[in-house]
Amino acid sequence: NPFAIFDLPIAFNVDQALLSERYLVLQKSLHPDNFVTADAQEQRIAMQKSTEVNDALKTLKDPILRAEAIIALNTGKTEDLEQKSTQDVTFLMQQLEWREELENIEQSQDENALESFAKRVKKETKEMLTALEAQLNEQQWPTAAQFCDKLRFLKKLADEISQVEERLFEL
């Protein structure tokens, strides 16, 4: 439970400053220098705990991973939550349209169109995060998992937009 590691309530909105503060305290206490004189088992346990802290931090900093952790903690399901939106035909069509639009923008090398597209994707992501939070608050776990899958796609799309942006500005 990443929330328990940092002694935080299980919630979608996490106080990032408090998270960073607690991370630094935990990392300091688990630093290898503190275990120089310890036996091999204690060193291994400290290393393992340090890895758990790093993994928990990664989970709590990423809204998709954080939401998936909340869903898993509340449903007891720890299997991969991906592939939930593949039955959403409307979203599948939207994915195809977005990918085609990005491809056309790259081919035309239209920087203004790319900027506009990036803003629309960012807006869609923000709206979907708000909807995800509402589903989590209402304990609608299957729907929340679908939003996680959609957000994962939008994150990949944003990465692709950045790559296209880099290629366009290299010219």
Residue ranges and their predicted role:
Residues 1-171:
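C-terminal accessory/regulatory regions appended to core domains
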